[in-house]
């Protein structure tokens, strides 16, 4: 998600300005989960990777830009689509229990399952997928969908965010979820300068008190924002409230930053002692997976601390890592399973050399002593 939104120069500035306390790694590799997504055919690469519970012992994975085909068969045997899904039976990293899905055309060619279809959709719009959650009141899964548009069809870097929608998948639906609904939302900032642009949907926390906390990112500083709404009012945007630094405000424009230097995808999870852990990639794109600890879902949050230093960029100067987040649904007691994405600034050249590059990596963080 937004993986190409920064040129190499901005990545360098991000690395130089990152503010996490750089200490030794406090996480460990989760090798079995990383190996789960190392595949030769069918789905063999994607970023994004969010998880939502979808019934008893069933987890929905969903991804943004996805590679489909034969990873060893050359470019003619590969297709990129803008999003895809997978269903895992159970909570263990078993290849036999994980099935990937995407839509298909009349001749069987892979197609994107979630395509913008709302009233304000323009030709050429596509979705990258944000955070999501299962809403037991509505008996549906909700996924934030960023509506993107390339200003120049010949330039992959010319994309812009034109709006944020909600994808609604009723419980019991069968992938690739052709029966889903789409709802336009007012939850994106459409300013004229980079510091005025942003959106909600980077992360979601469903609290026991009935509120759904939705995190947003704004500006070049990657400022963290938060909104909340009760589960029964998710589709009524007049009921959404935005934290302004002192109270919950009706005006989204009054949203106050909780922190800066986070990533376009992240997670907020409760800790056993009543605090909350925010997991993100320092500065959006960097080798550092970081955390902040907060006293409530809206903060205040403590300083950024390093969880893990990714090594992929040391292997190749074109590789970069981004958008770390936790997956509590798949985490063992007393720990958090965390993913991060790996990509290349020279994507199509590098994917030919290393077809296993473009897939999530996983680490495991022990919660004791945080």
Q: Where is each model-derived feature located?
A:
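Hydrophobic core register within WD40 beta-propeller blades
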Residues: 51, 132, 204, 266-268, ...
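Beta-rich catalytic cores
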Residues: 45-47, 127-129, 198-200, 262-264, ...
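Beta-rich carbohydrate-recognition and catalytic domains
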Residues: 24-44, 53-125, 134-193, 208-263, ...
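Bacterial N-terminal signal peptides that target proteins for export
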Residues: 1-10
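Cleavable N-terminal signal peptides
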Residues: 10-11, 21
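Short, linear, compositionally biased motifs with a strong N-terminal bias
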Residues: 14-15
